[in-house]
Amino acid sequence: MVRLTVDLVMKNSNVLRNRKDESLARHLRRITHLNFSNKNIDEVEDLTMCRNLTVLYLYDNNINQIKNLGSNLTHLYLQNNCISCIENLSGLKRLEKLYLGGNCLTVVEGLEGLRELRELHIENQRLPPGEKLLFDPRTLHFLGISLSVLNISNNNIDELKDLAVLENLTQFVAADNQLKEIKDLEFVLSKWTKLCRMDLSGNPVCLKPKYREKVTIISKTLEILDGKEIKEMARQFLLNWKASRISKKKKNLENMTGPSLLPQLYESDNYRSLLPVYNQNFRHQLLEQPKYIVMAHTQSCNKHGQLQRSAGKRNISVIEDIKSEARGMESFSGCIPESECVGGQHGNERPGYPTNLINLWKGEKDETEGIP
């Protein structure tokens, strides 16, 4: 057992006394850096006399509790010890870098007072089998103000949504975890608008088709992904390619629905609300088929409820397929312009729906039969 005491500091300090009669307190105040790595230290005694100590190396020891540290520390290295709880750090108001990798932490907590903390390294925790590293929401909230570098590699982490509050991150390392979903990345990357470097190597998500291309498009600021540089020319190519695909889909959709409803259908995040309201089972089945086929039919209705010839047999055959599902439907509300519909005050049908389409859903004779 080795304790880090003031006497041990004096013996190992590189700062020499100016005079033989220099007091101990004065000498300790002149020490700014201490390196006691790999010294079999298991306990730290009071170092508050080292008032100007800013950098302390205590990695590769047997320390199991964080305590008795100087209040002016800016860099603290505690990797590869036996620490199971983050505690007694609230007084370190100037701490900028904290290294806690290779310990026994299960929860990241107790960092609420560290408003100057820029880097947090907590990789490779010795976790119980089947458990993952957790994050205290209160700690994350406070870290979101200042933290720019976070390393959480090899901690069985399977989602990142709780980390979205860390909006000032510029470097993020989460290699060798259990991240699987691109959507999870998409959410946090939309919040991390300052991110320049990210390493997710060794995660299942890296095996997803077009993983690198998708991440490159999602994050406009990312410069290095999994150790490889992202060329701006490559990102621009992917963005242009995506825009081209969207434009092509938009044109295809316009051909199916007609131009009047296209902006609502295509730009809405909740296109389902723009579709007619069917009974639940029928609505589900319709969404499994081409989503706008009924809209294509209704858009083709003129003021008299007659189907224009441009609709063609394609729409008729589709409606024949869904006729049996539509019978008995009690409610239907759609996004059909009034100028294209009949009924309401001038007829017996429900307002805002083309006559021939309502008759078709009721199982009556299809007025569109015979149209080439």
UniProtKB/Swiss-Prot annotation:
Keyword Methyltransferase: no
Record carries keyword Magnesium: no
Gene Ontology molecular function terms on file: actin binding; dynein complex binding; tubulin binding
Domain LRRCT: 203-241
Subcellular location: Cytoplasm, Cytoskeleton; Cytoplasm, Cytoskeleton, Microtubule organizing center, Centrosome
Primary location: cytoplasm
LRR repeats: 30-51, 52-71, 72-93, 94-115, 116-137, 146-167, 168-189
Superkingdom of origin: Eukaryota
Keywords: Cytoplasm, Cytoskeleton, Leucine-rich repeat, Repeat
GO cellular component terms attached to this protein's record: centrosome; cytoplasm; manchette; microtubule cytoskeleton; microtubule organizing center
Coiled coil: none
CDD domains tied to this protein: PPP1R42 (cd21340)
Described purpose of this protein according to its UniProt entry: May regulate phosphatase activity of protein phosphatase 1 (PP1) complexes.
Name of this chain's protein: Protein phosphatase 1 regulatory subunit 42
Species: Xenopus laevis
Designated gene of the protein: ppp1r42
